[in-house]
Amino acid sequence: MNILDQLAEYSRLRVAEDKKKISLEEMKNIAIQTKNEKLCDFAFEKALKKDGLSFICECKKASPSKGLIEPDFRYLEIAREYEAAGADCISVLTEPKWFLGSDEYLKEIAKTVSIPCIRKDFTVDEYQIYQAKTLGAAAVLLICSILSEEQLGEYIKICDSLGISAIVEIHDEKEAGMAVRADARIIGVNNRNLKDFTVDTANSKKLRDLIPDDIIFVSESGVKSTDDIRVIREIGADAVLIGETLMRADDKKAKLDELRLS
């Protein structure tokens, strides 16, 4: 079993435990009743539709490929730094075992910043989508590799019903077709292969032509330099998601400024 399969399986176990505390029907009702102007009218999508390249900046304490990234995880301070530096959205890891994430990180960050947040986790059950909205997320991640085409379409419709967005993550040509057929409005190409953790930023360039222009195109992972950003701009991406590069920067504002202005 590769790491992606392990992450998906652990998500199923987490959901089963969460359902013992709050049932699916209860979680649905809470999500439907959750009112927040940052969650209305697909704020995440709107933030990515502005002119030029949008930046999604990630808060994460660790990762399976890099281990512990930030022992002293000042997540609220980091989120504030990102917002002050001009980030358009914030990605918050909530997966607890391999990424050392927490639902509380998302809940507190979403309350603290004025820009939209995405719950970065391994969605394997509709429960997690409703849960994400109650935590303050304006978007969720849907990974084609761990979902059937039927699930993907269903989960996008649930997001639509809640007024939140979905980044549909793809890794290859087959998944690109799956995402387009499911009526995804935001498609992210992960330049990191989650099965073996190899990184190839050319993956975004390779898959770009398969995505219609009316779909928001996001390049994810492996972005380290101004040269990487230039390539991403050249292929016509609408947004880029940057994690480790910013997390390891002593001056996050300076690093984001450097990348944004390249």
Where are these regions (language model features)?
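Conserved, mostly hydrophobic/aromatic
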Residues: L7, C57, Y82, A132, ...
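Catalytic cores of alpha/beta
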Residues: V124-L135, E173-A182, S219, V223-I242
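N-terminal active-site wall of soluble small-molecule enzyme domains
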Residues: C59, K66-I167, E173-A179, S204-L207
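Glycine-rich phosphate-binding active-site loops on the catalytic face of alpha/beta enzymes
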Residues: Q131-E150, G188-F197, I235-K255
